[in-house]
Amino acid sequence: MWFAVVAIFLALVAFLYRYVVGSGPNPFAIDTREPLKPMVFDRKLKNKVLKQGFLASRVPEDLDAVVVGSGIGGLAIAVLLAKVGKKVLVLEQHDRAGGCCHTFKEQGFEFDVGIHYIGELSNHKPLRCIIDQMTNGQLQWDPLENPFDNVVIGPPENRRIYQIYSGRKRYMDELKKCFPGEEKAIDEYVRLCKEVGQGVWVMVLLKFLPTPIANFLVRTGLANRLTSFSRYASRSLTDVVNELTQNKDLRAVLSYIFGTYGKIPKEASFSMHSLIVNHYMNGAWYPKGGATEIAYHMIPIIEKAGGAVLVRAPVNRILLNDAKEAIGVSVLKGQEEVHVRAPIVISDAGIFNTYEYLLPKDVQTMPAIQKQLSMLQHGDSGLSIFIGLDGTKEELGLKADNYFIYPENNIDELLEDYRSGNREESAKKNPLIFVASPSAKDSTWPERTPGKSTLTVVSFANYEWFEEWKDDKVKNRSTDYKQLKELFINYILEAVTEIYPKIKDRIEYVDAGTPITNQHYIAAPRGEIYGADHGIPRFSAELNATIRAQTPIKNLYLTGQDLMLCGFAGALTGALTCGSVILNRNLHLEAFSLAKRVQNGNNKKKT
């Protein structure tokens, strides 16, 4: 007994020294923002940064780390290490860097694939400060309209549209106008979201604490009592909302944003939901110049420290020594393997790809790895539709906002029926359609692509519906596959043109990306939108104490959304967590500290 107490005490002391006092280099030691430089719109110039192909001769010597995957989790950890002088190589299997932050161009239209809107980017907010430091202050943001989201419920003949405003008071006041008599429910919902969301630090704590202490907190149940976030983690969004109100439309409106983390309300943790509600409570933004601006401004920081970001570099395995320690990666170049050695290997490829594809079979069977895999499931897959339009946003009635379209307010039942149906029938009754205009959100669009506009649509779609065509050539899949895509496109377009009637005769381009499209371009094993599943089990104390940046393989680390949470901000948080472990310093606290110093400095300038 006493031995255990002493061991836990010593582990706690070590933790406090490592993550509170801070012993390693600090990438947030100084404010690295620079004066804004002119934006670059020339695609050839941008491609020189974003599309640097892999060659053995381009691999820097004496690497400090190699990162698999160039999504925001991979680029961010590379930038953090580069800022303290580390030489990092980032390897991307696609032909351009950025992961879900990349864009593509078809018939003169540019489409983003994953960045729709981001919250918490007011000046001096910690997230804004982190991104400013990651891009040396070169990434600019355009605010969305207020209201930024529109929730559409019901068929055309009985349609109700509820608008979601930013600003806590405005958000509540506008909802109360729509739902008289429900003031108490709305007040309690907003209060709960704030209280629960503020306790998210417990997730980070469990990943940082020494394993004996974390396990002690889990076994004794103390971890579930630390914050409201812990206490509500096992409660579904449906249960919490249903306790607040009997009004079915209000229930749907309070739940509408579940699509941004990919779980239907009855399967979603209220703790996860509270984070998203708080994330957008004070507004939403879109990257000025499009999503490629993110990677475009991060890569030079990696290169300045001697590193590189190389594309068309499919990593086929992680190299291990005889002691089963990671010592580098193997890249397939044609039929040959190129070995890249580094003392640290960081995977932004997702936990399933990392453990089930990149590690040897005998290592995959390690109990510690199997335990982690048993705790997770693949997330839900999705369908994206890309629409190119002839006309300006003014001519077509497009705004910098989003629409969430539901055929009725019984969301759980609609989605369960949709997911359990056969693919042809389900294509005709899509229960959730997210639609937005990236071109209307980007203030540089009229200069870059005059007279044209775009819409992007996202919805759920089962991987199994498309799985039979996964081995077809990407640009030459079968006629049956194309016909199924057309079926989904046609029925979804009906709903979209009801919201945007002016686009009916102005569509010049339309195509869809299915789960197997995601599988090919972003290496999502089952076409997942948000990596590992974000349902209730994802938020258990045991899982968060078990899945850490440091994997069971020495020198192999995880970064990105599978380590922490989904989405841009979640993957970025995963990079901070990974960097904290590698650099022996709590980068979450350091980022908050720098944000405070920058804010105080600006306040002094004003006075």
From Swiss-Prot:
GO terms for molecular function: all-trans-retinol 13,14-reductase activity. Its EC number is 1.3.99.23. It is found in: Endoplasmic reticulum membrane. It is a peripheral membrane protein. It catalyses: all-trans-13,14-dihydroretinol + A = all-trans-retinol + AH2. GO terms for biological process: retinol metabolic process. Coiled coil: none annotated. The keyword Nucleotide-binding does not apply. GO terms for cellular component: endoplasmic reticulum membrane. Pfam families: Amino_oxidase (PF01593). Its cofactor is NAD(+); NADP(+); FAD. Keywords: Endoplasmic reticulum, FAD, Flavoprotein, Lipid metabolism, Membrane, NAD, NADP, Oxidoreductase, Signal. Transmembrane segments: none annotated. Residues 1-22 form the signal peptide. It is an enzyme of class 1 (oxidoreductase). The keyword rRNA-binding does not apply. Catalyzes the saturation of all-trans-retinol to all-trans-13,14-dihydroretinol. In addition, saturates the 7-8 double bond of all-trans-retinol to produce all-trans-7,8-dihydroretinol. Can also use vitamin A2 (all-trans-3,4-didehydroretinol) as a substrate, to produce all-trans-13,14-dihydro-3,4-didehydroretinol or all-trans-7,8-dihydro-3,4-didehydroretinol. May play a role in vitamin A metabolism. Belongs to the carotenoid/retinoid oxidoreductase family. CrtISO subfamily. This is All-trans-retinol 13,14-reductase. It comes from Danio rerio (Zebrafish).
